[in-house]
A protein has these predicted regions:
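N-terminal targeting leaders of exported, membrane, and organelle-targeted proteins
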Residues: 2, 15-19, 73
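Sec-dependent N-terminal signal peptides
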Residues: 4-12
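Post-signal-peptide N-terminal segment of Sec-exported extracytoplasmic proteins
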Residues: 44-53
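Acidic/histidine-rich, surface-exposed loop or edge segments in extracytoplasmic proteins
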Residues: 53-60, 105-107
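Short pre-active-site segment immediately N-terminal to the catalytic Zn-binding motif
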Residues: 58-74
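Alpha-helical architecture
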Residues: 74-78, 118
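Catalytic Zn2+-binding segment of zinc metalloproteases
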Residues: 78-95
Length: 145
């Protein structure tokens, strides 16, 4: 089963037009922490990325590579992965002292659930930092032992 999954993942990655080295590095780091990164349409319609905390699966919509936002999308989902680790399997905020850029606000303000809005605010805050990759990696290492 896992050999088939790995082969399918490699096949999908080979079809992606030159995924960034940072994307592949982050994908490997997530997988070493027990997350499964799947390049396929997420179960939630219209999502670019999705983390299902129950089984630590992360879907990345293949369209993000055509849009040039593959790494940014995985950075966002990496923050959610760190949130799951921090909550010991239940997603929780990390208490970060950074704010998202103004252009990102509409992407999380539409959530009516305050907890979900806070979780998304943190993910967008990290995603929009100039050092977003390094910040996401440090959060993953800090919270996912």
């Amino acid at each position: 089963m896992s050999k088939i999954f790995i082969l399918n993942s490699l096949l999908l990655l080979s079809q992606i037009s030159n995924p960034e080295a940072k994307f592949l590095d982050l994908k490997n780091k997530l997988e070493k922490k027990g997350f499964q990164v799947i390049i396929a349409l997420p179960p939630k319609r219209g999502a670019y990325g999705l983390l299902r905390e129950a089984d630590k699966k992360i879907w990345i919509n293949p369209i993000v590579f055509e849009l040039g936002i593959g790494t940014r999308t995985l950075i966002h989902e990496t923050v959610h992965a760190a949130q799951v680790c921090a909550g010991k399997g239940k997603i929780k905020t990390l208490g970060l002292d950074i704010q998202p850029s103004n252009y990102a606000r509409p992407f999380f303000r539409h959530y009516t659930d305050v907890k979900r809005q806070d979780l998304e605010r943190q993910a967008y805050a990290v995603q929009t930092q100039p050092n977003s990759f390094e910040l996401a990696v440090s959060l993953l290492q800090k919270h996912c032992k």
